[in-house]
Structure formats: structure tokens, C-alpha cells
């Protein structure tokens, strides 16, 4: 079994994990029945994980969202999709491996899937550019979404990126323009679009495939206009204040649900999706199918109209009168 990568706030579980592994090795190497001891320790570890993860701060949720063993776009596709065929290239200049796409079936429903893809180790992350798509990636995504629109395929996007790639070449190739065109065209698409934040959803890089009829996110995923580190550097000239920025940015599922930005927060297994990826995949599949069923009853006009209204309402606020302000203070 691969060694689990434990985050700083999970360190209280280290000793329990060692004991569990020792008992498993004992069971493999001998005929001694240790099932009862193993069950007790696993139950205790699960309870402590539940206690830790039910009280995470926004800064700690970011660590969970960036966990190297957290299920990726391809992991989820392999879990609950059939007949997956990846499609390549933007038909302009290149094929960006940081943003993947293709067609598949979910419970016999043909769909188009797009999403950012990170790597598991340094070599894979370099090849995938750490999930940071270039203009060719967003243009590839748009090409595939137009394909889905033409053949009446619902679109499912998986968001997992720290942001769009901000290198010099990407800017020269029109990074901002590529994302802006995606935003415009996704409002025009006539088929249902469901976006899911499976890890971190950062800045315009996330929004470039995030205009949707339904926006879902996992319990420990984050969705933010800028990374807390960048926000702290801009506002306070001090990246060490990232935890303060994370709290102020309202990046968690519960905050975004309250603000009306996301439509559903999907509960994660105790310890996060990396502890029970198959369980997480089943939860995501169930949620996607439920929303697809609801959206399939709407006309093309109603879909686009609702999608536009959904985004127009983001950022709305109430302005209090002087009398109301006095009552509050």
C-alpha cells in the first residue's frame, strides 16, 4: 500500500497510522488473528479524522484541496465513466496537457468531459504544467464545447487549478483573450453545463471552464478569485498572512453556498477524498446525474436565460439606510 501523505494538522494521526500498519504487517506475516485490534484502531483513527476535519480553517482546507494524493480529473473519469475517448489539440498551434477533454458515457448518458489535470509527482506535474493551462488549453476546451453543442452532449467540467499559466509566452499568445472568449461562448452554449470544483479553483484559470448551469464543489475544495498567498502579498506585502487572506476571501464551500455562488457542496469522506477516493467518486457521480436529470427538462432558451441570470446575481448586495446602520451598530 502506498504511503499516505499526512498534512501538518493530521500529525496526531501519525502514531495511530503506524500502529495500524504494524498490525497489518503482523497479519500478513503470521496466522495470528488481529482483526479485533485492527478494527478498534481503525475506528479510533476514523473518529479522530472526523474531529480534525470537521473543524478545518480555510487555510487548512486549501492544504486538503492541494493534497498530492487527492483524486484528479482523470481519476474521477476512470471511476465512473465508460467509453472514455480523449480528444486532443486546439486546431491552432498545440495540445495543452494541463487541460484535458474528451467524450464518454455516465450511466449510458453521452457527455463531453473537460478539466484541468495535475500530476502525482514532480515529473508528471512538469509535464502537466501543475494544472495551469495555457491559451491553447482554453481554446481546446472551447473547440470541444462547440463540438458538444453541435451534437447535443451535456458538458461536465472538472476544475482543479491554481490558476491559468501566467508565463510570458502565454501572455503573448493571448491568455486573457482565450479565457474571455470562453466566458462569452459558454453563455451561448445550448446544452446543459455542470462545473465541479474537485480541488482548488483559482482565478480566471478556473472560470475559463466554470461558466455553468450548476456549480458543484467538494466540501474541502476551494474556489477563489486569487490564491491567498497572492492576495496577502498584494494587500499586506506579506505572503505569511495567507491564512488571514484565506479567511477574508470566503473560499470554502459553506461560504460560497451562503453567497449563492455554488449550487451544492458535496460531502467528503472523513479525512478528505484522498482517504476514500471511490466513495468520493460515487458521491460526485450521484450529484452530477441528479443535476443532469433536472437540467434535461429545460429548454435551450431557459437554460441560457437561467445561466445568464445566475452570474448576473453574483456580487449583488443590499445597501442599508442610515437608520438600519444605526440599528446594527
UniProtKB/Swiss-Prot annotation:
Keywords: ATP-binding, Cytoplasm, Fatty acid biosynthesis, Fatty acid metabolism, Lipid biosynthesis, Lipid metabolism, Nucleotide-binding, Transferase. Its EC number is 2.1.3.15. It catalyses: N(6)-carboxybiotinyl-L-lysyl-[protein] + acetyl-CoA = N(6)-biotinyl-L-lysyl-[protein] + malonyl-CoA. SUPFAM superfamilies: ClpP/crotonase. Pathway: Lipid metabolism; malonyl-CoA biosynthesis; malonyl-CoA from acetyl-CoA: step 1/1. Residues 40-294 form the CoA carboxyltransferase C-terminal domain. One of its GO terms (molecular function) is acetyl-CoA carboxylase activity. It holds the Pfam family ACCA. GO terms for biological process: fatty acid biosynthetic process; malonyl-CoA biosynthetic process. It is found in: Cytoplasm. One of its GO terms (cellular component) is acetyl-CoA carboxylase complex. InterPro entries: Acetyl_CoA_COase_a_su, ClpP/crotonase-like_dom_sf, COA_CT_C. Acetyl-CoA carboxylase is a heterohexamer composed of biotin carboxyl carrier protein (AccB), biotin carboxylase (AccC) and two subunits each of ACCase subunit alpha (AccA) and ACCase subunit beta (AccD). Component of the acetyl coenzyme A carboxylase (ACC) complex. First, biotin carboxylase catalyzes the carboxylation of biotin on its carrier protein (BCCP) and then the CO(2) group is transferred by the carboxyltransferase to acetyl-CoA to form malonyl-CoA. Belongs to the AccA family. NCBIfam families: accA, AccA_sub, PRK05724.1. This is Acetyl-coenzyme A carboxylase carboxyl transferase subunit alpha.
Amino acid at each position: 500500500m502506498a504511503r499516505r501523505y499526512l498534512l501538518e494538522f493530521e500529525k496526531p494521526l501519525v502514531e495511530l497510522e503506524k500502529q495500524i500498519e504494524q498490525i497489518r504487517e503482523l497479519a500478513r506475516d503470521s496466522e495470528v488473528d488481529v482483526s479485533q485490534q485492527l478494527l478498534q484502531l481503525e475506528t479510533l483513527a476514523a473518529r479522530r479524522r472526523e474531529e480534525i476535519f470537521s473543524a478545518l480553517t480555510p487555510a487548512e482546507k486549501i492544504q486538503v484541496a492541494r493534497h498530492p494524493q487527492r483524486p484528479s480529473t482523470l481519476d474521477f473519469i476512470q471511476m465512473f465513466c465508460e467509453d472514455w475517448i480523449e480528444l486532443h489539440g486546439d486546431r491552432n498551434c498545440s495540445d495543452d496537457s494541463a487541460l484535458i477533454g474528451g467524450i464518454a458515457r455516465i450511466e449510458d448518458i453521452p457527455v463531453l468531459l473537460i478539466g484541468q489535470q495535475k500530476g502525482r509527482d514532480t515529473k508528471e506535474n512538469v509535464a502537466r504544467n501543475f494544472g495551469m493551462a495555457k491559451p491553447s488549453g482554453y481554446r481546446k476546451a472551447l473547440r470541444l464545447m462547440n463540438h458538444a453543442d453541435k451534437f447535443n452532449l451535456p458538458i461536465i467540467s472538472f476544475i482543479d487549478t491554481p490558476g491559468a499559466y501566467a508565463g510570458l509566452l502565454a501572455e503573448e499568445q493571448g491568455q486573457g483573450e482565450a479565457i474571455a472568449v470562453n466566458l462569452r461562448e459558454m453563455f451561448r452554449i445550448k446544452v446543459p453545463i455542470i462545473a465541479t470544483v474537485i480541488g482548488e479553483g483559482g482565478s480566471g484559470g478556473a472560470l475559463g471552464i466554470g461558466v455553468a448551469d450548476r456549480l458543484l464543489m467538494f466540501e474541502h475544495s476551494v474556489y477563489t478569485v486569487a490564491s491567498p498567498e497572492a492576495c496577502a502579498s498584494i494587500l499586506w506585502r506579506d505572503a505569511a498572512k495567507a491564512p488571514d487572506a484565506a479567511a477574508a476571501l470566503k473560499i470554502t464551500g459553506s461560504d460560497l453556498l451562503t453567497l449563492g455562488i455554488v449550487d451544492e457542496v458535496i460531502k467528503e469522506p472523513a479525512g478528505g477524498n484522498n482517504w476514500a477516493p471511490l466513495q468520493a467518486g460515487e458521491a460526485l457521480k450521484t450529484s452530477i446525474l441528479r443535476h443532469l436529470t433536472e437540467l434535461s427538462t429545460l429548454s435551450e432558451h431557459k437554460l441560457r436565460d437561467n445561466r445568464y441570470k445566475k452570474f448576473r446575481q453574483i456580487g449583488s448586495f443590499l445597501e442599508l439606510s442610515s437608520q438600519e446602520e444605526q440599528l446594527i451598530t
